[in-house]
Design a protein with these regions (language model features):
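Extracellular/periplasmic, surface-exposed regions of secreted and cell-surface proteins
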Residues: 1-240
Length: 240
């Protein structure tokens, strides 16, 4: 993925007529600006899926993402994911249970990444000043610190769950527990000591955030006739 943008703007005043829409024809040209931006991203995905006798199910994915929003030191992020499932209702010992319609245990783990929004946030930026700043001469002032080691924010997710259904799928239960861990958090405008010559870093990696909990969902169809159907559902969860 590659995106390039070029732009030009002109600000003027004292137009000779409201019927003239070209700002360059105005009496006073106040400001002329131009610029360009360039962003590149490259990604790849490898995936392997396995299924045996409709009982044992597995999936493995590996994703690699590279972005020009990061410095050359930390440009690439590697994000794996794996999931395994066992449909125990297909086993001979459970097939004898006539009231059991379906049953599955599953476990999964995966990672995803987050990047900054602006492709130039990692670059050093300099401003030019008015001539009165230093002995009536213009000067160049550093405005933003270059971030060579800025890296991907990573979210790791674990999930363990069970799906089970009874009585021709008229009663189904889904239960799961999960844990999410966000590492190398991306902090926007992170404050730093003024003795550094700056007040903030545009982005800073630091810290982690953990989120875990459980959820239970129950659905029932106690009445299912030609002209009447009753659906009941119940959900409870806790997040820490």
């Amino acid at each position: 993925d590659q995106r390039t943008q070029d732009w030009t703007s002109l600000k003027s005043s004292r137009s000779p007529s409201f019927d003239i829409y070209d700002p360059a024809s105005n009496a006073v040209i106040q400001q002329i600006r131009s610029g360009s931006s360039d962003f590149r991203a490259l990604g790849g995905l490898a995936s392997v899926n396995y299924k045996f006798l409709d009982r044992y199910i597995g999936s493995f994915n590996l994703r690699a993402d590279g972005s020009s929003k990061f410095g050359a030191n930390r440009r690439w992020g590697i994000f794996p994911s794996v999931s395994v499932g066992w449909r125990f209702s297909e086993e001979a010992m459970f097939k004898a249970l006539k009231y059991l319609s379906d049953g599955k245990l599953r476990i999964s783990y995966g990672q995803t990444g987050r990047e900054p929004g602006n492709p130039y946030d990692r670059h050093a930026i300099y401003n030019t000043s008015n001539p009165s700043q230093y002995i009536d001469n213009p000067v160049i002032i550093p405005r933003q610190v270059q971030l060579d080691n800025l890296q991907w924010q990573t979210l790791s997710s674990w999930n363990l769950g069970m799906d089970i259904a009874f009585f021709n799928n008229n009663l189904s239960i889904t239960a799961e527990v999960y844990r999410k861990l966000t590492q190398d958090l991306l902090w926007d405008r992170y404050r730093i000591p003024k003795s550094s010559g700056f007040t903030t870093l545009k982005w800073f990696n630091g810290g982690e955030l953990e989120n875990k909990g459980w959820e239970l969902f129950v659905r029932a169809n106690p009445i299912k006739k030609n002209n009447l159907s009753v659906n009941l559902s119940f959900n409870i969860s806790q997040n820490i």
